[in-house]
């Protein structure tokens, strides 16, 4: 086994969220958005399952690529029996005092047509194109009220085709962008774009692994949102989706060429671990903690 690791091969593989009713969520993402269930693990003994969804049609960016070697995967974690509970089970990360995770984003080939299509399918919206000042983005709501941002790709087609949609990015809010960016750079990611919004007093940073594609045509991006001034607050500002009784968002996951070498490198860099490879029964995965205590899973490419 090689003792080195090549960060240029790393992928931002997936984003995990917990869902109340798996059947309802699978139907939403596959039948409405056209995603494909590319893998599923059921743990009867522990009473939960993991379902991995991706855009995988003939025109998809990562069509047919092995699960661990691709980007743009959505992992749905389902704990048996939650669908029988009354009311919402999970938090979406956008309401105080449990803000943290913000949204996932799908880029589309014609945003007006895509939004009209989603409305025809009965999809609820947090923000329609016509709402507010920003007429070029919309936010749909999934069955658990997680936000799905909709943004145009670099080229607009005459009519939206769900087979061209891409799982572009995942957004989390960060207290202080400097240590957060430094952390993700130690994972091999780079800031590929930055957008300041003086009126709203926030900045968005987009990080990713190397690619020649325009930002809106890619998959596997991480968006860090910094609300100006939070870095001056004492203690944690955001909820990571995993701590305490109220859960929702789980983690992002990077896949690496050599997990032993990668974790050794991360440890040498002083990055904190939630779970080291040697911890627990699962010796083939690790979890890092970023500066806001968000979990970052590490898996090996097959």
Curated annotation (Swiss-Prot):
The keyword Kinase does not apply. Substrate binds at residues 18, 79, 99, 103. The active site is at residue 149. InterPro entries: Glyas_Bleomycin-R_OHBP_Dase, Glyas_Fos-R_dOase_dom, Glyoxalase_1, Glyoxalase_1_CS, VOC. One of its GO terms (biological process) is cellular detoxification. CDD domains: GlxI_Zn. It catalyses: (R)-S-lactoylglutathione = methylglyoxal + glutathione. Its cofactor is Zn(2+); Cu(2+); Ni(2+); Mn(2+). Signal peptide: none annotated. The keyword Metal-binding applies. One of its GO terms (molecular function) is zinc ion binding. Its EC number is 4.4.1.5. Keywords: Cobalt, Lyase, Manganese, Metal-binding, Nickel, Repeat, Zinc. Gene3D superfamilies: 2,3-Dihydroxybiphenyl 1,2-Dioxygenase, domain 1. Binds 1 zinc ion per subunit. Cobalt, nickel and manganese ions can also function as cofactors. Monomer. Catalyzes the conversion of hemimercaptal, formed from methylglyoxal and glutathione, to S-lactoylglutathione. PANTHER family: LACTOYLGLUTATHIONE LYASE, LACTOYLGLUTATHIONE LYASE GLYOXALASE I. This is Lactoylglutathione lyase. It comes from Schizosaccharomyces pombe (strain 972 / ATCC 24843).
